[in-house]
Amino acid sequence: MAEVPELASEMMAYYSGNEDDLFFEVDGPKQMKCSFQDLDLCPLDGGIQLQISHEHYNKGFRQAVSVVVAMEKLRKMLVPCPQIFQDNDLSTLIPFIFEEEPVFLDTRNNDACVHDAPVRSLHCTLRDAQLKSLVMSGPYELKALHLQGQDLEQQVVFFMSFVQGEESNDKIPVALGLKAKNLYLSCVLKDDKPTLQLESVDPKNYPKKKMEKRFVFNKIEINNKLEFESAQFPNWYISTSQAENMPVFLGGTRGGQDITDFTMQFVSS
């Protein structure tokens, strides 16, 4: 807190001589009333603040006004501001305050974002082109056989999830889990041959948007029939045999003796 020692000669030119007429606004002097009211004043440099004295005694100007000011700014003079600072003036200052830098997005390690994405899914059953249903045979094997009547309750209900993969107009990547079981169909290499298996998973982590490639199948629709191509082994498909009660397997031929065409029936969850 410092007091103005004396009025500068430039300031005296605006002084009315009547002490009761001289008031300053807080954080000013942005505008001085009475003899100063027509002048829009501001500091040449920031940092000067004025405090109002609300008591008008017969005291000199020196005792009526106190100035809050940084010591290094005491020598600064008050000059008329050319115009009021507008919001749009900020646009001219921003390039001097901020330095523009390019931002590079590393897409190699975005698994966390993908895992947090919601997974769209549905429940369904599958039958091959001969209307054979898929049922469990042992803890980790599926077989295809004809079912009728109440036996249809034995067929497996799949939990089909739409996952990340190489999607195109005719291929939709999906994962096939078994409802109410922690099992997913997966494709692995056994004895140098692509093989279909049921793999146990942790239900806390599955299903997820970005499934490991061995779990992903490209769902292909042709003439109202569906094919399921392994994403891990292209041109290998979920297949059934012409014979009854044979295991479901991964086959490398289409349109041959092995059946690769299926129909899907939706099941309420």
From Swiss-Prot:
Subcellular location as annotated: Cytoplasm, Cytosol; Secreted; Lysosome; Secreted, Extracellular exosome
Name assigned to this protein: Interleukin-1 beta
Keyword Ribosomal protein set for record: no
InterPro entries reported in the protein's UniProt record: IL-1_CS, IL-1_fam, IL-1_propep, IL1/FGF
Residues at the site labelled Important for interaction with integrin: 171, 179, 181, 190, 204
Function: Potent pro-inflammatory cytokine. Initially discovered as the major endogenous pyrogen, induces prostaglandin synthesis, neutrophil influx and activation, T-cell activation and cytokine production, B-cell activation and antibody production, and fibroblast proliferation and collagen production. Promotes Th17 differentiation of T-cells. Synergizes with IL12/interleukin-12 to induce IFNG synthesis from T-helper 1 (Th1) cells. Plays a role in angiogenesis by inducing VEGF production synergistically with TNF and IL6.
Primary localization class, coarse: cytoplasm
GO CC annotations, alphabetized: cytosol; extracellular space; lysosome
Protein keywords: Cytokine, Cytoplasm, Inflammatory response, Lysosome, Mitogen, Pyrogen, Secreted
UniProt cross-references to PROSITE patterns, sorted A to Z: INTERLEUKIN_1
Comment field (misc): IL1B production occurs in 2 steps, each being controlled by different stimuli. First, inflammatory signals, such as LPS, stimulate the synthesis and promote the accumulation of cytosolic stores of pro-IL1B (priming). Then additional signals are required for inflammasome assembly, leading to CASP1 activation, pro-IL1B processing and eventually secretion of the active cytokine. IL1B processing and secretion are temporarily associated.
Any one GO BP annotation for this protein: cytokine-mediated signaling pathway
PANTHER family, A to Z: INTERLEUKIN-1 BETA, INTERLEUKIN-1 FAMILY MEMBER
Assembly and interaction partners: Monomer. In its precursor form, weakly interacts with full-length MEFV; the mature cytokine does not interact at all. Interacts with integrins ITGAV:ITGBV and ITGA5:ITGB1; integrin-binding is required for IL1B signaling. Interacts with cargo receptor TMED10; the interaction is direct and is required for the secretion of IL1B mature form. Interacts with HSP90AB1; the interaction facilitates cargo translocation into the ERGIC. Interacts with HSP90B1; the interaction facilitates cargo translocation into the ERGIC.
Propeptide: 1-116
Family, per entry: Belongs to the IL-1 family.
Entry annotated with the keyword Transmembrane helix: no
Gene name in the database record: IL1B
GO molecular function: cytokine activity; integrin binding; interleukin-1 receptor binding
